[in-house]
């Protein structure tokens, strides 16, 4: 029986030395939402709690300003 090798999770924001996550950085924020528009939990992404809170706040601000969608396109 082969064992599945799971890649070690790490926080990209800590590794890059990010101080504050910007709500205008849409390219970064899109990596942390699902196709349906939900915020991906930190247990899946490996993001530290401090940055997960900043990430959630930034995504919610970007949604409010119509930079990110609340949901998918319902086609």
Curated annotation (Swiss-Prot):
It comes from Escherichia coli (strain K12). Keywords: Acetylation, Ribonucleoprotein, Ribosomal protein, RNA-binding, rRNA-binding. The modification N-acetylalanine is found at residue 2. GO terms for cellular component: cytoplasm; cytosol; cytosolic small ribosomal subunit. One of its GO terms (biological process) is translation. One of its GO terms (molecular function) is small ribosomal subunit rRNA binding. PROSITE patterns: RIBOSOMAL_S18 (PS00057). This is Small ribosomal subunit protein bS18. It holds the Pfam family Ribosomal_S18. PANTHER family: 30S RIBOSOMAL PROTEIN S18 (PTHR13479), SMALL RIBOSOMAL SUBUNIT PROTEIN BS18M (PTHR13479:SF40). HAMAP family: Ribosomal_bS18. Part of the 30S ribosomal subunit. Forms a tight heterodimer with protein bS6. Belongs to the bacterial ribosomal protein bS18 family. Binds as a heterodimer with protein bS6 to the central domain of the 16S rRNA, where it helps stabilize the platform of the 30S subunit. Transmembrane segments: none annotated. Gene3D superfamilies: Ribosomal protein S18.
């Amino acid at each position: 029986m082969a064992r599945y090798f799971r890649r070690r999770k790490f926080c990209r924001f800590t590794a890059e030395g990010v101080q504050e996550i910007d709500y205008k950085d849409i390219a970064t924020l899109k990596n942390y939402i699902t196709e349906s528009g939900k915020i991906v939990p930190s247990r899946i992404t490996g993001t530290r709690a401090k940055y997960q809170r900043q990430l959630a706040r930034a995504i919610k601000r970007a949604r409010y300003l119509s930079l990110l969608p609340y949901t998918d396109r319902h086609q």
